[in-house]
């Protein structure tokens, strides 16, 4: 005789929808668990008698019920819906911008991150490419579904994807750092000090900690949260009615400012936030909520960025044009991209990097000399780079094994109530501090070797960096 008990966990904050299934067959208990909509992981344990098997199964069920799980019917909850940003991109009538190089990723691209070493692009097919500043491909990953955005948090680079996972790209295998509930139609993500902010189609905004546990969630009267930005001051949420700021600790609303059009993109600098809107403007606000300069464009704004401290403000519209303004709101120039409308953009060292509806990562020279030459009709010869053949990336749960930790740091997995936690066992670290570590590769009593362990910015937990291997006995 077989007995099946099926449970689900559905946190109100919408960040954890998981299942737990216990199947008892004679003397065997099989436990399967994971995210709703996925196959999950399974464990099987044999017992000396059917009675002992039933008692073990009942104990496991009680543990889950006490931690928030509830009885449910399998299959009633649907997999996540996905909203992909759509721009009906028109050709620009402005002069061509001075493009230095453009990389054809192969599919519409939403994710971009630029630093002194690398230029990263993530596209609709889940392909991520890292280029140097001359446009040469240095690295690539292939993720299961489309990339919504690329987000940096200190030295960590993350990819938020349509499958609801946020992947850490610091090692050679992308690892799942956060798993967002299937009923959340994700619009945008941001991360600061290991805390993930999520905004969605329904106007909700939530903050999730480094253990993938909800800190708080706010249901608003708005919708279409295309902007969420994390800062020391709070979480800034841009939506159908403007921009709202929430307190980091408990999600208390600090201020709200209305915009005439819906917010379609957001940016922040040290003391300001910027919202590109459907009414062809960029609204700026101080981080204390005071309205500041409004930047007027000719079409709906789907991306924006600034030079250091807002000295210049850049914008991209749905007519394949980019704009530049000074701090006072004066338009300095408007030029065509030549490669579609910008879904996202970043500025660095007199260059604007855009990712577009045509799937390009384009590097545009916005120095005064280059812009003046472009306005006069003189353009550089743009280097055109095609994407290399896509290389398969191992699944996020793939683990190499080693019997020698070498210079790595050893971690151990242990049970803490209903949760599996991690601690550092290598001498010299605080063994009582928790560790941010992928949930879907944790196995009780297992040991792992990681390239590096670094303290979080606030010093209250550790974060892994680089490659992860399973430590085994020789």
Predicted regions and their residues:
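A short helix->beta-strand "capping" segment at the edge of beta-propeller domains
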Residues: 85-107
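A short beta-strand motif characteristic of beta-propeller blades
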Residues: 97-104, 136-141, 173-180, 213-219, ...
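Beta-strand-rich domains and repeat architectures in extracellular enzymes and scaffolds
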Residues: 100-126
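Blade-level signature of beta-propeller repeat domains, shared across WD40, Kelch, NHL, RCC1
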Residues: 339-389
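Structural detector for short beta-strands of small beta-barrel domains
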Residues: 396-420
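Beta-strand/loop nucleic-acid-binding surfaces
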Residues: 426-444
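OB-fold/S1-family single-stranded nucleic acid-binding modules
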Residues: 456-474
């Amino acid at each position: 005789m077989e007995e099946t008990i099926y449970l689900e966990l559905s946190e109100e904050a919408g960040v954890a929808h998981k299942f737990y299934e216990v199947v008892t067959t004679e003397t065997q208990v099989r436990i399967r668990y994971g995210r709703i909509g996925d196959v999950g992981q399974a464990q099987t344990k044999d017992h000396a008698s059917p009675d002992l098997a039933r008692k073990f199964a009942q104990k496991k069920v009680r543990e889950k019920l006490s931690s928030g799980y509830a009885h449910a019917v399998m299959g009633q909850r649907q997999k996540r819906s996905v909203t992909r940003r759509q721009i009906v991109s028109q050709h620009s009538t402005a002069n061509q911008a001075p493009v230095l190089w453009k990389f054809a990723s192969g599919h519409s691209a939403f994710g971009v991150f630029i630093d002194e070493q690398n230029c990263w692009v993530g596209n609709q097919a889940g392909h991520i490419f890292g280029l140097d500043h001359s446009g040469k491909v240095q690295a690539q990953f292939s993720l299961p579904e489309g990339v919504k955005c690329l987000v940096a948090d200190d030295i960590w680079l993350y990819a938020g994807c349509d499958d609801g996972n946020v992947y850490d790209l610091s090692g050679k295998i992308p690892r799942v750092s956060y798993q967002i509930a299937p009923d959340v139609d994700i619009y945008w993500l941001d991360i600061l000090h290991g805390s993930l902010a999520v905004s969605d189609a329904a106007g909700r905004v939530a903050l999730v900690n480094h253990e993938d546990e909800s800190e708080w969630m706010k249901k608003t009267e708005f919708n279409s949260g295309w902007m969420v930005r994390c800062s020391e001051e709070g979480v800034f949420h841009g939506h159908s009615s403007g921009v709202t700021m929430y307190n980091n600790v408990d999600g208390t609303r600090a201020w709200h400012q209305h915009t005439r059009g819906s917010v379609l993109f957001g940016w922040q600098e040290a003391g300001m936030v910027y919202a590109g809107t459907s009414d062809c403007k960029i609204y700026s606000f101080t981080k204390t909520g005071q309205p500041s300069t409004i930047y007027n464009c000719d079409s709906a704004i789907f991306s924006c960025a600034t030079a250091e401290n807002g000295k210049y403000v850049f914008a991209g519209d749905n007519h394949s044009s980019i704009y530049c303004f000074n701090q006072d709101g004066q338009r300095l120039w408007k030029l065509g991209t030549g490669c579609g409308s910008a879904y996202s953009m970043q500025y660095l060292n007199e260059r604007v990097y855009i990712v577009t509806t045509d799937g390009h990562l384009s590097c545009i020279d916005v120095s005064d000399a280059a812009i003046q030459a472009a306005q006069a009709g003189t353009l550089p010869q743009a280097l055109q780079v095609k994407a290399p053949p896509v290389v398969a990336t191992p699944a996020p749960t793939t683990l190499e094994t080693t019997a020698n930790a070498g210079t790595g740091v050893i971690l151990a997995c242990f049970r803490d109530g209903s949760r599996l936690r991690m601690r550092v066992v290598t001498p010299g670290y605080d063994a009582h501090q928790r560790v941010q570590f992928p949930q879907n590769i944790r196995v009780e009593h297992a040991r792992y070797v990681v390239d590096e362990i670094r303290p979080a910015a606030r010093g209250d937990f550790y974060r892994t960096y680089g490659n992860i291997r399973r430590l085994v006995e020789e």
